[in-house]
Amino acid sequence: MDLGIAGKWALVCGASKGLGFGCAQALVREGVNVVINARNADVLAQAAAKLIAASAEYASARGQKDSQPAVVAVAADITTPEGRAAVFAAAGGPGRDFDIVVTNAGGPPPGDFRDWDRDAWIKAVDANMLTPIELIKATVDGMAARGFGRVINITSSAVKAPIDVLGLSNGARSGLTGFVAGVARSKIASQGVTINNLLPGKFDTDRLATTVRAASEKSGKSVEEIRRTQ
């Protein structure tokens, strides 16, 4: 399948593993140049090596060995102004001129709402609502000016079917959903820019394992029992 996006530039957050890595890999296989971001430099470097190999395969299959998709890795905390600045200033990257942005911040810890203080809520909202908004704000006008842009926010199916132990995530991601619904319907829609949320269900990632353990501790059921009911 040719999606017609070869040569575009994409920013993929949380790309060292899991769904973020899967998105980056799929984009590279379509000939897209990627800037990948995560906090753990070692794990991100391993992901970059795999993506570079996929990039070489893409170029080789098309007889373009000297012109393969770029893979730029930036180890930084994207939830901070400094982290976002590092991504936009990355050597070999496009600056803020991304054609595709995949926001994918790690979810806040599961637990009981009675135990969450104001700081816990602020951290959740900052990472899972405000950070994607800041990335959209930094890139969307450039997309509109060029007549093409795609923003994908990886949130959670819990936005539509809330899970009690994921209250921090439910709240923050629902706020992002409301914001995106308005912006996606604004003038940019007629300028070739789309903004969508991806609400993944259950994938066997580290995040799911953490959620299952939390549900096990709260219910008194074994991890195996919880997994069987997923």
What annotation goes with each model-predicted range?
Residues 9, 16-18:
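Conserved glycine-rich cofactor-binding loop
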Residues 150-175, 180-189, 201-203:
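Catalytic loop of short-chain dehydrogenase/reductase
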Residues 136-137, 181:
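A short, exposed helix-loop element centered on a Lys and neighboring polar residues
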